[in-house]
Each structure stands twice: as structure tokens, then as C-alpha cells.
From Swiss-Prot:
Similarity field: Belongs to the PPR family. P subfamily.
Major location category of this protein: mitochondrion
Gene Ontology CC: mitochondrion
Intracellular or extracellular location(s): Mitochondrion
Keyword Repeat: yes
InterPro entries xrefs: Pentatricopeptide_rpt, PPR_P_subfamily, TPR-like_helical_dom_sf
Protein name (record): Pentatricopeptide repeat-containing protein At1g22960, mitochondrial
Keywords tagged on the record: Mitochondrion, Repeat, Transit peptide
Pfam family, one: PPR
Transit peptide: first to last position: 1-11
Keyword Transit peptide tagged: yes
Amino acid sequence: MILCLRLCLRASRSFFSISTTNNNNNLSRFLFRFSTLPHCAASSSSSSSNLESYYANLILSSHGDSNKPNRKWSSHQFRLLLTDPNLLIRVLNMIRVKPEIAFRFFNWIQRQSDVKQSRQAFAAMLEILAENDLMSEAYLVAERSIDLGMHEIDDLLIDGSFDKLIALKLLDLLLWVYTKKSMAEKFLLSFEKMIRKGFLPSVRNCNIVLKVLRDSRMMNKASAVYETMIEHGIMPTVITFNTMLDSCFKAGDLERVDKIWLEMKRRNIEFSEVTYNILINGFSKNGKMEEARRFHGDMRRSGFAVTPYSFNPLIEGYCKQGLFDDAWGVTDEMLNAGIYPTTSTYNIYICALCDFGRIDDARELLSSMAAPDVVSYNTLMHGYIKMGKFVEASLLFDDLRAGDIHPSIVTYNTLIDGLCESGNLEGAQRLKEEMTTQLIFPDVITYTTLVKGFVKNGNLSMATEVYDEMLRKGIKPDGYAYTTRAVGELRLGDSDKAFRLHEEMVATDHHAPDLTIYNVRIDGLCKVGNLVKAIEFQRKIFRVGLVPDHVTYTTVIRGYLENGQFKMARNLYDEMLRKRLYPSVITYFVLIYGHAKAGRLEQAFQYSTEMKKRGVRPNVMTHNALLYGMCKAGNIDEAYRYLCKMEEEGIPPNKYSYTMLISKNCDFEKWEEVVKLYKEMLDKEIEPDGYTHRALFKHLEKDHESREVEFLERLLLS
């Protein structure tokens, strides 16, 4: 024992010969702060000090020249440091004069399986590194502490006796780690603690969390962080304002957008190129083309170089409203400015033409492109599939493979979706297998599409089998995959199992579902007639920090209309307008169709008029909804006039338009009109489907139907 003490004393003298007076003061400060040992007799205190000195000297003398931990260090050698966090803290403070070595040793300690973890030890290590500006190393230590679930470490930094500047430096670092790990809730908790105790986070960290909240669609919380910044004097930068503008556009809060850019002007913060592009893109996506145009002009007058990225949102905004002449006008402006349309520009046109049923124009545009890409083909394939033209989509797929363009996962997923929609689930499964031979492996979207197909077909056992295969392949289901399964359970009437899946998703992903998942869940509840639960979910969206969008409202409005609750639907529509959530063309379709189906044709036309007044351009769906109402009411002559009006407005009728007229003429036994309409469909290359044939021959016995279709088409072709 005496020999041991002599060795310890010798080690102590050796170590203290390298220390300075200032460092000794630091040691005293740290030993006092973290020590939880009782104040023992002098001999006990001396023995403890000798032990600390022994370990400190051992670490310093054996660390080696490498930046890596010494391979000769062993857990047996440092057993006491592994099991006694207080001793470890005191030893770390004794070697704080060599922070790199302290970090290497601490790193080594963390790799040992039997180490006893301590928040205080992590806090001590973080302070040593921060005092020496070793912030990269400090980041790794902070990340490790968070991975271990030591989220209360911020309490030690805030409430302990740390130097305030060092504490703020480390608190900012913890916030940075939280944002890098997308742990928005944990960030907000630390952020609020800091503010309450007078520790103001850096604007850089505030900007990062604003982006995380924006990307998570947690707009209410983003606004709260922004307001807190302003209230406590954290000066916002152009990045702050850009992020908030983007958040407000995504939430559809255009009134707040105006307040934010005016606040930028008031603070004399100059708009950047990014600011202008956010404003142009945001107003264009929300159909506010006059405002988008104004900021585009301001951008050019401010001397910023305009690029296709500045013009493309304008083109897309006009195209979404079917204003193709205005869109081509923007393209002419591009050319006059010496800027050539990009492949993305052409893809915008292809997508819009498909959306408006002008599939032949879209195909012609693709053929005229010098360098179409896989997105060009995928977009047109999707357009064909939406129109039920799977043969044309397959031929386009063959064209793609015949060229130098390689199909992507999106290509296969688009085709699989088309096969599922047409009920060809075996073909969809075969295409999934074919993908792997091309070294394109199914992803969560592939499997979810198949699950959705089987659910829609009522085959829940196969849906479950495909879902389980996805899990066996190690593919993690996303929110949409969980929701697709839940919708299947809802369709079978098992709402309890559906909500268990909801809880499983939250438990697995460790975060609340996003707005899309809530919208799909509300849709499923509406479809099974559970409006009370749907409304409950809609209100819950606010409580979890999300903002309902036009999709949320449209879904519940449809539920009310399908249940004949027209007043409740109108109230919800008015609430949308009060909240400055602008109804989309889908919202108006739901309102028009819901009233037309119930024989409330006058109200349906009122919504059509209101839609146009609000600058929302009708599409073939809204026109068909009115056409359906006229046919249902027996106003066949008015329906014909309306069909002509559609074509005059540049919206060509589709197979559903003709099918409704064919069906009503069959009811009136106007067979010449029926044949004329059917021939007109074929002449326009509008492919009749099963619905058309059922309408055409609904007064015949079922076994005569196929022969009559064959006879009619031979007659027309001759």
C-alpha cells in the first residue's frame, strides 16, 4: 500500500510540473462544481487526489502521437474511470490543458461497453472543447449525448455555473445537432428554455429550424419561432425572411406573405435573387399571376440576371389555369431576352397539356423536343394512363427504351400505377419483377402502389402480403404506406385497426404524421361515412401544429355533400375563404358535382360562376359535372349546347362527356343520336370504355352486349 502511494505521489509530481497556475484555478473550479464526494478526512482527500493525478499522468504519458486512441489502453487499466463518472470528470479537468488528448480519451471511453454514462461528464467534455474552439470535436460529443437520449444536458448548461459565453456556444451547438437530425420538437424545447433564461440563440440556428419546420409543414410553430425572434431582438436576415415567405406560400397564407415582404422593406433588407424567385414561384403556384408578374418585373429592374428558373414558374402558373397563349407569351419573352427554354420548360407544357386533356398536343410537343429526358416521357405516360390509354403509355415506354434514355424508378412506378388502376394487378406484379432485371429495385412507392391496387380491388389479404414483403426487403414504410393500409382497414369497416396503424406509425417514426397523412386519413373516414371522426381529425391538425390546406377542407366538404348536408358544406367553404385558403379547381368540382348530383343545378351553376370570378379556370371535370346535372334533369338540348360551349372554350369533351350524352339518348330511345355520338368519339380517337358500352347497351340483355359492340363498330368502320 505504501509502495502504491509513493508511485501515485511520484506520478502526481510529474503531472503537476506541466501545469500552470491558471490551469490549477480551473481545476479547482471544476472539481468543486462536479464533485459529489463527501468531504472526508484529509488523508482520504489526499488519496483521492493522488488517484486522479495517477490517471491523468497515465493518459498524458500513453496517448501516443496519433490522433486516434492508444491501442494499448484497456478497460481493465481504466476500470475506475469507466464506473465512476465523478472521478472521470475530475481526471478530464486535470488534463484540460491538452484538450485534443482529453477528447481522444473521452472518445475511447465511449466505445467501452461497460462505461457508466453521465450528463455531467458530457458537459465537462463539451466545455473543455468549447473553451479551446474545438467545435468539430464538440459537435461529435454533443451528437453522442443526444443519441444516448441526454436531452436534459441543456439544463446543465443553462442552470450550471458555466461561463455564459461558453454555455451559449454549446447551446447553439446542441440546437445545430437537433436541426441536423430533424428533431424539431427537441429543438423547440431547448429554444424555449434558452429564451426563458436569457440565452439568445444565433440567428443562424433560428434560420435552420425555420427551414426544418417549413419542410415539416409545421407552419404555426414556424410563425411562433419567428415572432419570438422579433420579440427578443434576434435580428432576422434575408434568409429568415425568405424561409418565412416560402412557409407562408406553402400554407396558402398570402395575407401573411404581403406582411413579410413589406416588413423586409421597412427594415431596409434588400431582396436577394432567392427572395424574388420565391415570390414569383409562390404567387404563380397560387394563381396570382398579376403579383408574380410584378415581382418578375421588379427583379429585372433591380439588375438581377433572369434565368429559366425565373420564367418557368410564370409559364407553369399560366398553364395550370389553361392560359396557354399567356404561357407562350412568356416563352417569347424568354427568347427575346436571349434565354432558351430548357427541357424543364417543355416538361411544364407537356404536364399542363395532359392535365387539360390535350394529350395529342403533348405528344407532338415531345416529338419536337431536341433532347427530351426521362421526365418528359414519364409525364406523358402518366397523362396517357390518366386518360385510360394504357396501350399508348406502353408504346411510349417502348420508345423510351429504344432510345438512349434509361427508364427510372418513376417510369416503372407510373406504369405499375396504370396497371393497378385498370385492375390488371397480375401485370403490375410482373412489371415489379421485371424492374429488378434492369437493376431498378422497387421502392416504398412501388409497394404502396400495389397495396393501394389490391385494397381498391377489395383483396386485403394480397395487400397485406405485399406490405409484408416490403418489410422483409428492409424497406421502411412511410406515412403514405401506413395510410394506404389504414384506408384498407377503414373500407372493411375496421376503424380500430386503422387507428392502431396510425399509432404504430407515430411510434415507429418517432414523429407526428404530416399534413398529407392527416388528409388521407380524413378522406378514408369520409368515404366510410364517419364524418364526426373526420371533423375531429381536421381539428386535431391545428393541435399538432399543422395548418389545414385546401385539400383538407375539400375532403370534408365532399363528405358533407355526399351525406346531403349542403349547409354544413357551405359553412366549411366560407370558413376556407375567411382563412384565406383559396379553393382549387378540385374544390369547385366537388361543390358543383355534389349539387348537380342532388338535382340542385342552380346552385351548381352558381359555384361555377363564383369559380370563374375568383380566377380559377374550369377544366373538363367541372364541365362534366354540370353536363351530368343537365342530363340527370333531362335537359338534353341544353346539354348539347353546353358540349359546344366546352369546345369553344378550348376544353375538348372526353369519354365521360360523350358517355353521359349517349346514356341519356338511350333513355329517350334516340338511337340515331346514340350512333352519331359513338361515331364522333371514334373519329376523335376517344377510346370508349366499359362504362360507355354499358351506357350504350344498358337496355339489352348482358349476353348480347359484346356482340352488339362488335356489330356497331364494324358498321361504323364500313
